[in-house]
Curated annotation (Swiss-Prot):
Lineage: Eukaryota, Viridiplantae, Streptophyta, Embryophyta, Tracheophyta
UniProt record similarity statement: Belongs to the thiolase-like superfamily. Chalcone/stilbene synthases family.
Keyword Lipid biosynthesis on entry: no
EC number of this enzyme: 2.3.1.74
UniProt protein name: Chalcone synthase 3
Length: 395
């Protein structure tokens, strides 16, 4: 047996790695055609769940919807389907089979819609895709949604797949962190990332003893987003980054046990939220910013462009207040919350898309609202925070 010399191993490792940072080369989004107008939703929700007798609770839910700052949400579940599946409309009735039957089919399908758009924008043959990262909080099967997507798109059978289930709202940051490592450590890699979320697993009727469940019913919605990530873009074929990823970190916030919990049981996926989630995030967010931007010598948070998971308006309000952010910093985030609701892991990718679109429309110098450096935050169960440092590119 011939042992390789350290120098030759070093050379092999160096040759395997990319030279430059991972960049987001394309973005695509998709939503179910069915949508609800938030102002009309309380009447619809209490009618479809046979809960119109719960008048006080309905008034509370109306106030939640009013405060949500959401205008509309897309949902796969239609009134006709819910009428045919009354157990999904009860508060805690066994209904997992019906829910799973929907999402194991529809999550990959919605993901495919977003992926097709991203691949079209990228402009390269899909045979160049080397890795697939698929993320969803909805539905678990083997083989998983990553396999189904690979088949639906007709990707090469040798594509390297990674499936992320049950991560929750912070996972839009997680997929970027993983895709960054894959792209930078595998020369020539092109990573297709898909986040696809359908609320069929969480929809249920109201309960006057579990108001935290109602919060989710007022916020959550359906959507899928896809990106292509790669290092060393091939400009000869038109590849160009929209944003570059500089660093990525994950942390569990102190004293946050039980702040956000999700449990997949016979009744579907139930979420439990403590009231102090906005306070926990805002109290700890500056530490994450300091750690991420100290190497760059940046401490003025208003000098950054912002992509924050819109868990709800209270989180955004508290973060703005704590950091002294100007109102326009969260414009793209609040726009996505208003037009789409909380689509869990897909949200931050929608916000990236909205930011690059508006930056071009406004004629500013960069994809990051004219600014050079930016931050992307994911918040979710744990309480877990993902922090991604982004670098914009000229428009």
């Amino acid at each position: 047996m011939v042992m390789g010399t350290p120098s030759s191993l070093d050379e092999i490792r160096k040759a395997q790695r990319a030279d430059g940072p991972a960049g987001i080369l394309a973005i695509g989004t998709a939503n179910p055609a069915n949508h609800v107008i938030q102002a009309e939703y309380p009447d619809y929700y209490f009618r479809i769940t046979n809960s119109e007798h719960m008048t006080d609770l309905k008034e509370k839910f109306k106030r939640m919807c009013d405060k949500s700052t959401i205008r509309k949400r897309h949902m796969h579940l239609t009134e006709e389907f819910l009428k045919d599946n009354p157990n999904m409309c009860a508060y805690m009735a066994p209904s997992l089979d019906a829910r799973q039957d929907i999402v194991v089919v529809e999550v990959p399908k919605l993901g495919k819609e977003a992926a097709v758009k991203a691949i079209k924008e990228w402009g390269q043959p899909k045979s160049k895709i080397t890795h697939v990262v698929f993320c969803t909080t909805s539905g678990v099967d083997m083989p998983g949604a990553d396999y189904q997507l690979t088949k639906l798109l007709g990707l090469r059978p040798s594509v390297k797949r990674l499936m992320m289930y049950q991560q929750g709202c912070f996972a839009g940051g997680t997929v970027l962190r993983l895709a960054k490592d894959l792209a930078e450590n595998n020369r020539g890699a092109r990573v297709l990332v898909v986040c696809s979320e359908i609320t069929a697993v969480t929809f249920r009727g109201p309960s006057d003893t579990h108001l935290d469940s109602l919060v989710g019913q007022a916020l959550f919605s359906d959507g899928a987003a896809a990106i292509i990530v790669g290092s060393d873009p091939d400009t000869s074929v038109g590849e160009k980054p929209i944003f570059e990823m500089v660093s990525a970190a994950q942390t569990i916030l102190p004293d946050s046990d039980g702040a956000i919990d999700g449990h997949l049981r016979e009744v579907g996926l139930t979420f439990h939220l403590l009231k102090d989630v906005p306070g926990l995030i805002s109290k700890n967010i500056e530490k994450s910013l300091d750690e991420a931007f100290k190497p760059l010598g940046i401490s003025d948070w208003n000098s950054l462009f912002w992509i924050a998971h819109p868990g709800g308006p209270a989180i955004l309000d508290d973060v703005e207040k704590k950091l002294g952010l100007k109102a326009e910093k969260m414009r793209a985030t609040r726009h996505v919350l208003s037009e789409y609701g909380n689509m869990s892991s897909a949200c931050v990718l929608f916000i990236l898309d909205e930011m690059r679109r508006k930056s071009k429309e406004d004629g500013v110098a960069t994809t990051g609202e004219g600014l050079e450096w930016g931050v992307l935050f994911g918040f979710g169960p744990g309480l877990t925070v993902e922090t991604v440092v982004l670098h914009s590119v000229p428009v």
